[in-house]
């Protein structure tokens, strides 16, 4: 899937991401021993960015252009590892794996973060969502956990019905098929479902 490929070029940074990076460095120099409240820090960065002139933003926009050129150049020479996402065909009728409580939380809050912090990179958005989730009280997490539990319960019923139907269909189509091969299909289906979940997260991050 390429997520762990160490040779894949680092993603390009936006002008706002460079600005936030600069703000972090300034904060570390002024307050080397103090910890950063990420939510408060991001809010201040966003407010400061909105009041900056085009001339002040120009430096960061030039940095972003340079990084985009670097990224485009590296991507031209990048060759993905062989055999990625090949081999198994996914059944479009297979039930999708349910999202976790954290994933439901991210889906709800990501649009607001993008609106409040335009230009924030995918990595910084994910980090902010993670910190927001960890700051939530147990009672605030409960609605997401309850919804995730219901979706998981529904998925388990759906996947059981799907597998029963798949075995029934396989029995009709291939009477000469070895009995042991049916059991082998189940782990593969589980692997496919895990890939589906990872791909959904990647797609949502890239929106």
UniProtKB/Swiss-Prot annotation:
Cited function: Multifunctional protein with various roles in different cellular compartments. May act in a redox sensitive manner. Associates with chromatin and binds DNA with a preference to non-canonical DNA structures such as single-stranded DNA. Can bent DNA and enhance DNA flexibility by looping thus providing a mechanism to promote activities on various gene promoters. Proposed to be involved in the innate immune response to nucleic acids by acting as a cytoplasmic promiscuous immunogenic DNA/RNA sensor. Involved in inflammatory response to antigenic stimulus coupled with pro-inflammatory activity.
Species the sequence originates in: Gallus gallus (Chicken)
Matches recorded under CDD domains: HMG-box_HMGB_rpt1, HMG-box_HMGB_rpt2
Region span, Disordered: 52-102, 162-207
Cysteines engaged in disulfide bonds, as pairs: 23-45
DNA-binding region: 9-79, 95-163
Name of the protein in its database record: High mobility group protein B2
SUPFAM superfamilies per the UniProt record, alphabetical: HMG-box (SSF47095)
Cysteine sulfonic acid (-SO3H) modifications at: 23, 45, 106
Pfam families per the UniProt record, alphabetical: HMG_box, HMG_box_2
Biological-process GO terms, alphabetical: defense response to Gram-negative bacterium; defense response to Gram-positive bacterium; DNA geometric change; DNA recombination; inflammatory response to antigenic stimulus; innate immune response; regulation of transcription by RNA polymerase II; response to lipopolysaccharide
InterPro entries in the record: HMG_box_dom, HMG_box_dom_sf, HMG_boxA_CS, HMGB
GO cellular component: condensed chromosome; cytoplasm; extracellular space; nucleus; perinuclear region of cytoplasm
Record GO terms (molecular function): DNA binding, bending; four-way junction DNA binding
Entry keyword annotation includes Oxidoreductase: no
Keyword annotations: Chromosome, Cytoplasm, Disulfide bond, DNA recombination, DNA-binding, Immunity, Inflammatory response, Innate immunity, Nucleus, Oxidation, Repeat, Secreted, Transcription, Transcription regulation
Subcellular location(s) per record: Nucleus; Chromosome; Cytoplasm; Secreted
PANTHER family assigned to the protein according to its UniProt record, in alphabetical order: HIGH MOBILITY GROUP PROTEIN B2, HIGH MOBILITY GROUP PROTEIN DSP1
Biased composition (Basic and acidic residues): 52-76, 162-172
Family: Belongs to the HMGB family.
Compositional bias per record (Acidic residues), positions renumbered to this chain: 187-207
Main location (coarse class): nucleus
The record's account of how the chain is modified after translation: Reduction/oxidation of cysteine residues Cys-23, Cys-45 and Cys-106 and a possible intramolecular disulfide bond involving Cys-23 and Cys-45 give rise to different redox forms with specific functional activities in various cellular compartments: 1- fully reduced HMGB2 (HMGB2C23hC45hC106h), 2- disulfide HMGB2 (HMGB2C23-C45C106h) and 3- sulfonyl HMGB2 (HMGB2C23soC45soC106so).
């Amino acid at each position: 899937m390429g997520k762990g490929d160490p040779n894949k070029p680092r993603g390009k940074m936006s002008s706002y991401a460079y600005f936030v990076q600069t703000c972090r460095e300034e904060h570390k120099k002024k307050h080397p021993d103090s910890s950063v409240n990420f939510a408060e820090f991001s809010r201040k960065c966003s407010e400061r960015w909105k009041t900056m002139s085009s001339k002040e933003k120009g430096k960061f926009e030039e940095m972003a252009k340079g990084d985009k050129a670097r990224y485009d150049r590296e991507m031209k020479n990048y060759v993905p590892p062989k055999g990625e996402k090949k081999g198994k065909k996914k059944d479009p009728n297979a039930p999708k794996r349910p999202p976790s409580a954290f994933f439901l939380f991210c889906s709800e809050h990501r649009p607001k973060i993008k609106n409040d912090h335009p230009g924030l990179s995918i990595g910084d958005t994910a980090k902010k969502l993670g910190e927001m989730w960890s700051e939530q009280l147990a009672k605030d997490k409960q609605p997401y956990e309850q919804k995730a539990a219901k979706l998981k319960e529904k998925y388990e019923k759906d996947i059981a019905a799907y597998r029963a139907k798949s075995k029934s269909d396989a029995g009709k189509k291939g009477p000469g098929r070895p009995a042991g091969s049916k059991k082998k299909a189940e782990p593969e289906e589980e692997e496919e479902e895990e890939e589906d979940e990872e791909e959904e997260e990647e797609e949502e991050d890239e929106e």
